[in-house]
């Protein structure tokens, strides 16, 4: 089985969110299961310098972008048993930031066509091309409309498209069809690519892929509804026979409190008390009151409305009347950043607002905290709660998307469950469930059992990789 995994980012080379983690961990797990899996991403300027210097030039060729004929270099590097390819074009990718440029349509039109040209140039034919999010959305379109019709090399290649966040769809002016792809407006007028008055990369992928996946079972159902479907719900209902939810996992090599070099004291489920040394160290480092008995609640997140920050802002003053500590790590919208800075100023020994993305501090927060807050408005899968479980930090989540699938509400009478959850997007419900969690925290026997349940949860990539592999095999035999 040969699989080409196409993404706009991949850890450890470069990442801005969960997609980068998936593109770094899932291919590695597939390779362990005997799949010849290769990953391709753009060669951005910001790629990890240490790794960038190890990239080896393979070959170059020209790629048609409408009437343009652009240079494309292919570099490669093998990491953890997986070959990574890097599509090089200084004009498109050697600039600050991965996304948000005025010509993103052109940049990723080039990338998508370069990927299809690359496999022919390298004479490596995958059974399946696995595309991820809108930046790769035109690959299934190009494959079906053009490459399969022109060249027998491509005729039996299948395509999978994974939706990591349906809110970002890549919609651009219809003029990109002739300008960037050399097509007429038929695909716009027949509505296969039409979204409002634009052309949607993601809509095209949904229409032309052989299989559609998303990153949790619940999110696969949610995006078929008007509330979560971002006006593609009707199309996903039509395509529901080819839509599957497969839960993300986390990389158990990277996130392992037993040998994590970024935390102060390593521990595992058999010596949970060592976790408290991490707590005391972080309290001291952040200027909080050093007391292992005070419950510490952490958030490591983008500070955006999607993450439920409106709820936390609304209850923060009432919440902080409790004897707790709140640790925030992340950046995002300015009004949230300012609010948490103000809380830090007002409640200096109870609140630590770290308005930056700091991977070292993130690992320390997972290891030190007692509870991990994710009251998301929507959450396709979520990785934070999975990492928190691994480190014995009990997730407090809203029942949506992957949070609903991975967190089982604690039952104090049976001792079952691995976290706490609430259903409605309501600030008072959030406050109530946090206060309930605090009540359980002070019952040390119950809390100790809950932490063991959390740390014994299995969220590795192995099970998910099996589901992907079965899907690839099913597609390749069609």
UniProtKB/Swiss-Prot annotation:
InterPro entries given for it? Glyco_trans_1, GS/SS, Starch_synth_cat_dom
The EC number(s) attached to this protein equal 2.4.1.21
Residue numbers binding ADP-alpha-D-glucose: 15
**Catalyses which reaction(s):** [(1->4)-alpha-D-glucosyl](n) + ADP-alpha-D-glucose = [(1->4)-alpha-D-glucosyl](n+1) + ADP + H(+)
Keywords from the named record: Glycogen biosynthesis, Glycosyltransferase, Transferase
**Example of a GO MF term:** alpha-1,4-glucan glucosyltransferase (ADP-glucose donor) activity
Q: What class of enzyme is it?
A: transferase
Q: Pathway, according to UniProt?
A: Glycan biosynthesis; glycogen biosynthesis
Question: A biological process (GO) annotation for this entry?
Answer: glycogen biosynthetic process
Q: What exactly does this protein do? A: Synthesizes alpha-1,4-glucan chains using ADP-glucose.
NCBIfam families per the UniProt record, alphabetical: glgA (TIGR02095), PRK00654.1-1 (NF001898)
Q: Into which family does the record put it?
A: Belongs to the glycosyltransferase 1 family. Bacterial/plant glycogen synthase subfamily.
Q: What is the recorded name of this protein?
A: Glycogen synthase
